Amino acid sequence: MAAALRASTLFLVGFLIGVVVTRLPLSTALPILVGAIPNAWNVLDSSWRYTARTDGEVLNITYGLADRRRQSIRLDRIHAVQITQPFLWRPLGWYEVRVSVAGYGASASGKASGSTRILPVGTLAQARQFLPADAAPTYASPARAKWVSPLDYRQQTVALTGDYVIVRNGRLNRRIKAIHTSHIQELTYRRGPISQALGLATVDLDLVQGPVRMAARNLTLADATALLARLRSRQLPGLKPPR
């Protein structure tokens, strides 16, 4: 059911109805169907009978409809976590969890070397098990940020709790992202022409390659500078011997 409520699947269903109602020529409809059907199938196949269990320092994942697949991820290689609630999932209280894993960069074919979805669909309580303890926002976008982010500016917040950074954004599709400060690769302070005129700045948190992208967007100059200073003083991990 969760797969059916994804935008790509709804598009496919709506398109098929449109083909019947409008009698769209097959020569026009076929290329669109060829592109849409594989995506809908991938969503269903990668979510079917999905289980994720921890065994010591390893997260074991099993999933698949046509072909059962198994995958093991060392917990210390999970660098960032993202909880997403698509707009259509809100009435059902469903959430999805994805992670960025060190060493899961894209291959030559453009595909990641392993699954980064560790909870295809679950409750908020289940999703929060992958996050540090929640905290009140430390920084938030001011009201004038509505000129550059009219939909999301009220939801754009950053919380610093212990050694973690938690970023929230998204009004339609809600997202919560978290990372241990030691896993931040680089920090980038940026201001575009409009942001300069509004007295705003964004701090990008550069992470390992993966689905999680983090940025403290459209903060006041004082807040962006303070956040940058605090994160620059983070404790960096020492070199570890290879396992």
Where would I find each of the regions flagged by the language model?
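N-terminal basic, Ser/Thr-rich segments that initiate or prime the first beta/alpha elements at protein or domain
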Residues: 1-243
